[in-house]
Amino acid sequence: MSKRAYFGTDGIRGQANRHPMTAEVALRVGMAAGKLFMSKDDRRHLVVIGKDTRLSGYMIEPALVAGFTSVGMDVRLFGPLPTPGVAMMTRSLRADLGVMISASHNHFADNGIKLFGPDGYKLSDEKELEIEALMDQGLQEGLATPDKLGRVQRIDDCQARYVEIAKATFPKGLSLAGMRIVIDCANGAAYKVAPETLYELGAEVIRVGVEPNGFNINEECGSTHPAAMSRLVKEYRADIGIALDGDADRLVICDEKGQVVDGDQIMALIADSWAKAGRLQGGGVVATVMSNLGLERFLKARNLKLERTQVGDRYVMARMREGGFNVGGEQSGHVILSDLSTTGDGLLAALQVLAVLQESDRPMSALARQFEPVPQKLENVRFGSGKPLEHDAVKKALAEAEQRLNGSGRIVVRASGTEPLIRVMAEGDDEKLVSQVVKEIVGAVKKVAA
């Protein structure tokens, strides 16, 4: 695959108002993607655009709109809406393209652009390369004549539509009556729709992270900072806590004791429940190289398989589609239930967990830990430039670490696709050895990254 100049593992992402997350780049994305997804017939073409609650969304959105309308595409604006909601609305409105403006779990200063095809799935690497090629060419050719410019309209009921779609995924005849739930929306895109969905299903809802101001998205809240959720669960004696990230495509949960449960455990719970109901497809689960070995062992004990992909929920979804799987995701909390959505959806995954809990006579603490994870250690090393992983010293440290584990665990070292970080992960039954090999690899990376 050719090297991509703009797109990473999850669209284009970076600090707002710095390359590549500038108004100029957003304009070029709109023009290039618009040209690529407009067919040659004379019908009107449509793109839908949603965003999270970052201040910079007000800069990126009009730049994208200018790009799309300049090549003749009509635009529908949703305002704040979860990423999976944008994917759903792309399909339901029969749009040619869907766009989400978000940097997911990142700090407010970052932003990003994610693109969805007319089928509601994230674009392939090949499509992103085609867009990049058009962005780097002269874009003045093919501009719409004044009478063919795109028209723009704001859609006011998209949040209500998403709530209804989410509620429809909950088992018929079941409600959340009698359940007390803490929901942390990370001051992000789901700040209205997630609490409303739970409330309309009958739950008593304690809300946090529902006062976005443009700057506080993911700030000490949401799935990357679950302490706020855990504290409130214990304070209000809730049955469960749910924490979403800024664009609500991932989640973590906690039990009634405030103990946090990651994406691996959530996938195990849903897969086990669906397998018992005869609903699980593909004979197992798709996850990434970062998922815990304990998940693999848990599934194997139930005659189910774990298939691994590179990091990135779109790669998980691609493998799910190829192999006919309907449960997949990432340890970080992207959980994809392809019967229900075309991308990771934190709220829909939470509803499936809540259904299992409501139908059980056991507390969440008895359901949450489906398997015993093997000791796993992850460290991130920030670097300025260059390719630390190609350095001989790092390669030597990796080879020595593999020898020391001697087949009793796994090592995954990779460059982040969204931040200037090298992620070093090791896992195995010997916790002390795992910590040692991570320390040695991190030390080697730091030396060459300095």
UniProtKB/Swiss-Prot annotation:
Mg(2+) binds at residues 104, 245, 247, 249. CDD domains: GlmM. Belongs to the phosphohexose mutase family. It is an enzyme of class 5 (isomerase). Activated by phosphorylation. The modification Phosphoserine is found at residue 104. Gene3D superfamilies: Alpha-D-Glucose-1,6-Bisphosphate, subunit A, domain 3, Alpha-D-phosphohexomutase, C-terminal domain. Its cofactor is Mg(2+). Disulfide bonds: none annotated. InterPro entries: A-D-PHexomutase_a/b/a-I, A-D-PHexomutase_a/b/a-I/II/III, A-D-PHexomutase_a/b/a-II, A-D-PHexomutase_a/b/a-III, A-D-PHexomutase_C, A-D-PHexomutase_C_sf, Alpha-D-phosphohexomutase_SF, GlmM_bact. Binds 1 Mg(2+) ion per subunit. GO terms for molecular function: magnesium ion binding; phosphoglucosamine mutase activity; phosphomannomutase activity. Keywords: Isomerase, Magnesium, Metal-binding, Phosphoprotein. This is Phosphoglucosamine mutase. Catalyzes the conversion of glucosamine-6-phosphate to glucosamine-1-phosphate. It catalyses: alpha-D-glucosamine 1-phosphate = D-glucosamine 6-phosphate. Its EC number is 5.4.2.10. GO terms for biological process: carbohydrate metabolic process; peptidoglycan biosynthetic process; UDP-N-acetylglucosamine biosynthetic process. The active site is at 104 (phosphoserine intermediate). It comes from the Bacteria.
